[in-house]
UniProtKB/Swiss-Prot annotation:
The keyword Hydrolase applies. Residues 830-1085 are annotated as: Helicase. ATP binds at residues 833-840. Belongs to the ssRNA positive-strand viruses RNA-directed RNA polymerase family. Residues 964-1116 form the (+)RNA virus helicase C-terminal domain. This is Replicase large subunit.
Length: 1616
């Protein structure tokens, strides 16, 4: 028993603690089911398309306001008041949702076109023409219907079934759909309708008198009327102007005239009666007769629109107990007027009635007054002495936040300007992670000054009251009034000497509490309404059984849930689907599952129409028209004549797909090859198919693709024949472009009416004298075309597509059995190669011409392959084994061989996928290799209206091979290819920069005389090609025509100024155009387009990056011996010349635009404007968001204008922005890294690369802890630091994971243009307490010293405590005659990118140098999970790892990390010289070394966003390292020096002198002008716009060397 209780208790405790896995699994399952149910419920909502262009905020407004709908925002239609206009359709659908489907409905003033488009045949619209605007609106609705019908007619479509009833009703009985009478006088009849009648009024009840509304509803026997109208509660407060902010509209009232208009746009206004609208708002009962009344009830308010319903009430159904005998006062007074004495008795009888009484009241809530207070504002005119006083509503939280804060100001700080500054700052928003962290107060900026004055006076009065209270009302000789004015005078000083007199005389301020009283307004106003009706009889309520309707609704709900999985389910017409299920007596769930399977391509059936609607399904499955109507007929008859001629005779050309309800069975196998003569004199109508968009394909995907290919041939044949028939019918209307492609021969005169560009046409269309049209296979003699006597005209085309399509149809017809193609079992391999990868070369190396077959799309490609294969003189490639695709299809069976072992298809992805499947089947091969490029131009369906579904375009293959090395493309094009292809694309070309572009002034400027074009000429469009040919250019082709070809030089031309869809960054046509050349490509264009942008980007790619794409063979090196020399710099004293303007000019040339920035008030702007920040988990003390006001001392003003910022003041926002920039949002780029093992390998490489061999093992006899090491550390500390250690007993360690956070007051200047678009964040300092530094400072100081002693100082420089002279000595033995690669590794976000792996590397280095295990573990834990506290700004957060900027190992730790990173990626054994300092590095390698992919390695292993730059001169720690033939000189960056001369933080002249001396120390080398030319080259390498700068270098020397002259660079700010 005890065991059972113990087990029960234990299980219960585990359940409570969350340790019970069964309970946890059940809870998770329950949570999952709940989420699934919720999402299913959301997907079942009605779908509404919102086509108006709206902003993201307005999108959120509409979505939140109408959760009943699933709204899709297309943003495809610009319109006035787009939000309100779009919401109108949502409001209409919401009102119609309230009405039972199919019930007779009156739409008062509605849009009858909207109901027709929705297929609502049960709605009657009353649309009276009350003014001219109504007539215009009604005509617009008619136009929309005509536009819709014309669009259907143009596409040969019919009105969908779900709209047919409504449109038929409108066509036959338009008065049943819409009338132009007012609703009160509408004559619409309800004879055939017996159900309940409903009405809706969408923004139309304004114009119906409220007293007539109930009677009008009763006259139409309306059961319930739903209405929507715009209104605002503030109109009940008798405001003359009210804004509706959400829809950007407003009401203006002038007497009884209420005007509604939209703001910020020019549109018509709407005027209504204010008193009439007020009745609709405030009344509850709308009498209809002496018995019935319509009672109003508000439903909801959405986006400034009020919804309500008017329900028909029979007052005789009221409980009889409410009846009583009372006095009808009106009847009594009326009778008394007739006679007082003689008819008194009669008057009392008439007034005594049986009455029913009821009453109701409505509370109107004023949301804008919630949490608001009424604040008085004061003003006075100094000219007229007229006083004004007004009251405004202001946020209560805002008012008391200001009052409470400024109440803490000291007497001197309590000034009007400080109050105004604080009010401005707290009005701005602070958003943290999308959530408002500081209260958002939307206070009108125009009121801030007046509000600040009120707050100031209110606080002054409060201070005085406190003083009086403290002194127990001992006021002394001064009165209360005098005290108040003393305080005000003290605040204003002598600025307004008569202000007290004016204020008192005008009685603007009363010295009472009421004068500055802040009141709370009422939130509610109640309106009452009373109903009085006579009682006569009782009526029983009817009973309605709704169970059946509920069951049907549940079935439909489940079916729609099934349909909701479709991507386009929002466009599925639910009403038509319901009607279809009812009319066909089909279970909705079964129908839904069939539709989902078909649309998801899971049923073996493909529907080629665009939208999955019931109307399109019906159109696809309906019977086609007969041949007599000129359309193709798909027949299901038995095949009596298995020939194309038989089909022609019957007027039928069969399709491989289904366009009826019976599968095609006319295509059967025929053993003998039929002749093309069967097409001769076939009627043109038998070949023309008017509509090809309703074809249904069945079977596996390959079968469907093959059927679609056959149908594409039929469609192409149909289109070509139809065009020639059109030309014959209207020869005179042929345009110029058509004349170049077609010809028309008049048979009687033997004259060409339209002369064709080619001759000897194989086919044409003949017009007989009987005006009949036939397709004819033409024959020629020496006089031309041989004609017949009954021919009138002959139309020919230069395109051979019809002739080839006829032949292909003849061939493919033989391969069908019972209308179904056979699919080959051969293995299909897709060889996906980049442009120029040698696909043709590979085919020739793999093919065996005795047993294999090569197929290519074009004749030129086939001839080229035969020529290359037979180049040795032995004929191996013939027309039997190297053929074009068209030749193989047209002449199938005529050759000696019909079966091949392997099939090679070049550029196979340019073919129709069904064509590829046919080729594999027809070759009878075992394996087929399809060579293509997935990113180049695919198969293009050029028959408009013919369906080619997207999933048909994907070729089904068994295996994919990739080729990613291009033998053709130069390096810059290879760089572009890497952006388009998966995997690394490499090249073998020696060309680096090959692309360029030129903007031409116009198309007319391109001609062979003034603009000869180099190499092959290409265009994007046929029209540009024809234009160039007409101007005299030769050998012009389109990009599509030369896919697969190679040219040395290419000139790409665009003459079309209008947008061309195929010219886009991700377009395959652009890819093909850029990859045809081997040496150069120049793009001539008349407009800016994406290709220009691509070429400009490629022109800016660094040559070093392009070297990374090159694939080279290894090179042999020969040892060379050169002389040994010692560094000695030539010294030439720099002349002291120049002026301030020289420095300003140089700065503006290097950094254009930076000096024009007015950034003195950037920090103030950030405080006063809205700001949105995204941060990680942290704690913010918002009470410190606004710092207490401080006196700002004037600083010296620089004469040199730079982008230097003013010193910043510490505060929550400033510190938080700095923390986000420096510590938050750290990159996460690294892959999976075995931290311990990888760190050990990296450290091994570090020691092997940098340390001397004899010092790679730690000195065990060396002690890290000694008095000498502590004394050395203490000697470097300030006295304040030593004082902090006075009470530290060193017994225990403080919290080593606790850090403090602060910011530097001066932002760091960047030598780029980012200051023009970014707010520079301050640098942060994250530091330990001095107690921790006292322990670990001496420790790591000794470890650093031991490390630096072990470094191979002849090759490596760890820049710690080194002078510029020592840097010159280190690089002094560089030989400028030896070719070198100067490499710089630029790492972004260096400190915060360091993670656990970096810490592991650093700890391993310290451990090997001798760090004790216990202290190493303590130090490790102190850098793992750390807490940052900023007491000044009120911020507390937690960080994992990262480099702390104020740590004792910050500098040396960063240095060893960058050195370790480079040692792990680069061949350090080949390094000549290397220098490391923090995150800076400079490396000198021999020319031609191979380097790995630095960016990838830095990302995956080191989590660094790194770029490796190859330069001519080094840049290290703000200094240029100039190596020359005599050694090396280090110049301080002159641009950085000029930037510092624009400093705005210099306090006084003494501070300026200290500043000058520090600059002199760092810029000492500028005194030597011997190497200014090399310095110019080095600066120009970094700043492309920098001019030669010797003049500015001399100017810097001049001013820095003269103390008095240097003072002229600044002005005294206190005197300005």
């Amino acid at each position: 028993m005890a065991y059972t209780q113990t087990a029960t208790s234990s299980a219960l405790l585990e359940t409570v603690r969350g340790n019970n896995t069964l309970v946890n699994d059940l809870a998770k399952r329950r949570l999952y089911d709940t989420a699934v149910d919720e999402f299913n419920a959301r997907d079942r909502r009605p779908k509404v398309n919102f086509s108006k262009v709206v902003s993201e905020e307005q999108t959120l407004i509409a979505t939140k306001a109408y959760p009943e709908f699933q709204i899709t925002f297309y943003n495809t239609q610009n319109a006035v008041h787009s939000l309100a206009g779009g919401l109108r359709s949502l409001e209409l659908e919401y009102l119609m949702m309230q009405i039972p489907y199919g019930s007779l409905t009156y739409d008062i003033g509605g849009n009858f076109a909207s109901h027709l488009f929705k297929g609502r045949a049960y709605v009657h619209c009353c649309m009276p023409n009350l003014d001219v605007r109504d007539i215009m609106r009604h005509e617009g609705q008619k136009d929309s219907i005509e536009l819709y019908l014309s669009r259907l007619e143009r596409g040969n479509k019919h009105v969908p079934n779900f709209q047919k009833e409504a449109f038929d009703r409108y066509a036959e009985m338009p008065n049943e759909v819409v009338c132009h009478d007012t609703f009160q006088t509408c004559r619409h009849s309800q004879e055939c309708y017996t159900g309940r009648v409903y009405a809706i009024a969408l923004h139309s009840i304004y114009d119906i008198p409220a007293d007539e509304f109930g009677a009008a509803l009763l006259r139409k026997n309306v059961h319930v009327c739903y209405a929507a109208f715009h209104f605002s509660e503030n109109l009940l407060l008798e405001d003359s102007h009210v804004n509706l902010d959400e829809i950007n509209a407003c009401f203006q009232r002038d007497g009884d005239r209420l005007t509604f208009s939209f703001a910020s746009e020019s549109t018509l206004n709407y005027s209504h009666s204010y008193s009439n609208i007020l009745k609709y708002v405030c009344k509850t009962y709308f009498p209809a007769s002496n018995r019935e009344v319509y009672m109003k009830e508000f439903l909801v308010t959405r986006v400034n629109t009020w919804f309500c319903k008017f329900s028909r009430i029979d007052t005789f159904l009221l409980y009889k107990g409410v009846a009583h005998k009372g006095v009808d006062n009106e009847q009594f007074y009326k009778a008394m007027e007739d006679a007082w004495h003689y008819k008194k008795t009669l008057a009392m009888c008439n007034s005594e009635r049986i009455l029913l009484e009821d009453s109701s009241s409505v509370n109107y809530w004023f949301p804008k007054m919630r949490d608001m207070v009424i604040v008085p504002l004061f003003d006075i005119s100094l000219e007229t002495s007229k006083r004004t006083r007004k009251e405004v509503l202001v946020s209560k939280d805002f008012v008391y936040t200001v009052l409470n804060h400024i109440r803490t100001y000291q007497a001197k700080a309590l000034t009007y300007s400080n109050v105004l500054s604080f009010v401005e700052s707290i009005r701005s928003r602070v958003i943290i992670n999308g959530v408002t962290a500081r209260s958002e107060w939307d206070v009108d900026k125009s009121l801030l000054q007046s509000l600040s004055m009120t707050f100031f006076l209110h606080t002054k009065l409060a201070v005085l009251k406190d003083d009086l209270l403290i002194s127990k009302f001992a006021l002394g000789p001064k009165t209360v009034s005098q005290h108040v004015w003393d305080e005000i005078s003290l605040a204003f000083g002598n600025a307004f000497p008569s202000i007290k007199e004016r204020l008192i005389n005008r009685k603007l301020i009363k010295i009472t509490e009421n004068a500055l009283e802040i009141r709370v307004p009422d939130l509610y106003v109640t309106f009452h309404d009373r109903l009085v009706s006579e009682y006569k009889m009782s009526v029983d309520m009817p009973v309605l059984d709704i169970r059946k309707k509920m069951e049907e609704t549940e079935e439909m709900y489940n079916a729609l849930s099934e349909l909701s999985v479709l991507k386009t389910s929002d466009k599925f017409d639910v009403d038509v689907f319901s009607q279809m299920c009812q009319s066909l007596e089909v279970d909705p769930m079964t129908a839904a599952k069939v539709i989902v399977a078909v649309m998801s391509n899971e049923s073996g059936l493909t529907l080629t129409f665009e939208q999955p609607t019931e109307a399109n399904v019906a159109l696809a499955l309906q019977d086609s028209e007969k041949a007599s109507d000129g359309a193709l007929v798909v027949t299901s008859r038995d095949v009596e004549e298995p020939s194309i001629r038989g089909s022609m005779a019957r007027g039928e050309l069969q399709l491989a797909g289904l366009s009826g309800d019976v599968p095609e069975s006319s295509y059967t196998r025929s053993e003998e090859i039929e002749s093309l003569e069967q097409f001769h004199m076939a009627t043109a109508s038998s070949l023309i198919h008017k509509q090809m968009c309703s074809i249904v394909y069945t079977g596996p995907l390959k079968v469907q693709q093959m059927k679609n290919f056959i149908d594409s041939l039929v469609a192409s044949l149909s289109a070509a024949v139809s065009n020639l028939v059109k030309i014959l019918k209207d020869t005179a209307a042929i345009d110029l472009e058509t004349r170049q492609k077609f010809g028309v021969l008049d048979v009687a005169s033997k004259r060409w009416l339209v002369k064709p560009s080619a001759k000897n046409h194989a086919w044409g269309v003949v017009e007989t004298h009987a005006r009949k049209y036939h397709v004819a296979l033409l024959e020629h003699d020496e006089f031309g075309i041989i004609t017949c006597d009954n021919w009138r005209r002959v139309a020919v085309s230069s395109e051979s597509v019809v002739y080839s399509d006829m032949a292909k149809l003849r061939t493919l017809r033989r391969l069908l059995k019972d209308g179904e193609p056979h699919v080959s079992s051969a293995k299909v391999v897709l060889v996906d190669g980049v442009p120029g990868c040698g696909k043709t070369k590979e085919i020739l190396s793999r093919v065996n011409f005795e047993e294999d077959l090569i197929l290519v799309p074009g004749r030129q490609a086939a001839e080229m392959i035969r020529r290359r294969a037979n180049a040795s003189g032995i004929i191996v490639a013939t027309k039997d084994n190297v053929r074009t695709v068209d030749s193989f299809l047209m002449n199938y069976g005529k050759g000696a061989r019909c079966q091949f072992k392997r099939l090679f298809i070049d550029e196979g992805l340019m073919l129709h996928t069904g064509c590829v499947n046919f080729l594999v089947e027809m070759s009878l091969c075992d394996i087929a290799y399809v060579y293509g490029d997935t990113q180049q131009i695919p198969y293009i369906n050029r028959v408009t209206g013919f369906p080619y579904p997207a999933h048909f375009a994907k070729l089904e293959v068994d295996e994919v091979e990739t080729r990613r090395t291009t033998l053709r493309c130069p390096a810059d094009v290879t760089h572009f290819l890497n952006q388009r292809y998966e995997g690394h694309v490499m090249c073998t070309s020696s060309e680096k920069k090959s692309v360029s572009q030129e903007m031409v002034s116009g198309a007319a400027s391109i001609n062979p005389v003034s603009k000869p074009l180099k190499g092959k000429i290409l265009t994007f469009t046929q029209s540009d090609k024809e234009a160039l040919l007409s101007r005299g250019y030769a050998d012009v082709h389109t990009v599509h025509e030369v896919q697969g070809e190679t040219y040395a030089d290419v000139s790409l031309v665009r003459l079309t100024p209008t947008p061309v869809s195929i010219i886009a960054r991700d377009s395959p046509h652009v890819l093909v155009s850029l990859s045809r050349h081997t040496k150069s490509l120049k793009y001539y264009t008349v407009v800016m387009d994406p290709l220009v942008s691509i070429i400009r980007d490629l022109e800016r790619v660094s040559s070093y990056l392009l070297d990374m794409y090159k694939v080279d063979a290894g090179t042999q090196x020969q040892l060379q011996v050169d002389s040994v020399f010692k560094n000695f710099n030539l010294f030439v004293a720099a002349p002291k010349t120049g002026d301030i303007s020289d420095m300003q000019f140089y700065y503006d040339k290097c950094l254009p635009g930076n000096s024009t920035l007015l950034n003195n008030y950037d920090a103030v702007t950030m405080k006063l404007t809205d700001i949105s920040l995204n941060v990680k988990d942290c704690i913010l003390d918002m009470s410190k968001s606004v710092a207490a006001p401080k006196d700002v001392k004037p600083t010296l003003i620089p004469m040199v204008r730079t982008a230097a910022e003013m010193p910043r003041q510490t505060g929550l926002l400033e510190n938080l922005v700095a923390m986000i920039k420096r510590n938050f949002n750290s990159p996460e780029l690294s892959g999976v890294v075995d931290i311990e093992n990888t760190a050990s390998l990296v450290v091994d490489k570090f020691f092997d690369s940098y340390l001397l061999k004899e010092k790679r093992k730690p000195n065990k006899n060396f002690s890290l802890f000694s008095r000498e090491s502590l004394n050395r550390w203490i000697a470097k500390q300030e006295q304040v630091t030593i004082g902090q250690l006075a009470d530290f007993d060193f017994v225990d360690l403080p919290a080593v994971d606790q850090y403090r956070h602060m910011i530097k007051a001066q932002p760091k200047q960047k030598l780029d243009l980012s200051i023009q678009t970014e707010y520079p964040a301050l640098q942060t300092i994250v530091y330990h307490s001095k107690k921790i530094n006292a322990i670990f400072g001496p420790l790591f100081s000794e470890l650093t010293r031991q490390l630096l002693d072990s470094i191979d100082s002849s090759r490596f420089l760890f820049f710690t405590r080194k002078t510029p002279a020592q840097i010159e000595d280190f690089f002094g033995d560089l030989d400028s005659h030896v070719p070198m690669d100067v490499l710089e590794l630029d790492v972004s976000k260096y400190d915060k990118s360091q993670n656990e792996f970096h810490c592991a590397v650093e700890y391993e280095i310290w451990r090997r140098l001798g760090l004790e295990d216990f202290l190493a573990e303590v130090w490790k834990q102190g850098h793992r999970k750390t807490t940052l506290k900023d007491y000044t700004a009120g911020i507390k957060t937690c960080l994992w790892y990262q480099r702390k900027s104020g740590d004792v190992t910050t500098f040396i730790g960063n240095t060893v990390i960058i050195a370790s990173c480079l040692a792990s990626m680069l061949p350090m054994e080949k390094l000549i010289k290397g220098a490391f300092c923090g995150d800076d590095s400079l490396l000198y390698f021999p020319k031609g070394c191979e380097y790995p992919d630095i960016q990838q390695a830095a990302n995956l292993m080191w989590n660094f966003e790194a770029k490796l730059f190859k330069k001519q001169y080094g840049y290290f720690c703000g200094r240029y390292v100039i190596h020359h033939d005599r050694g090396c000189i280090v110049y301080y960056d002159p641009l950085k020096l000029i930037s510092k001369l624009g400093a705005k933080h210099i306090k006084d002249w003494d501070h300026l002198e200290e500043f000058r001396r520090s600059l002199c120390d760092v810029a000492e080398s500028l005194n030597n002008c011997a190497y200014y030319t090399q310095l110019d080259d080095a600066v120009g390498e970094v700043h492309k716009t920098a001019p030669p700068g010797s003049f500015v270098y001399k100017s810097l020397v001049k001013y820095l060397s003269d103390k008095v002259l240097f003072r002229s660079l600044f002005l005294d700010g206190s005197s300005c």
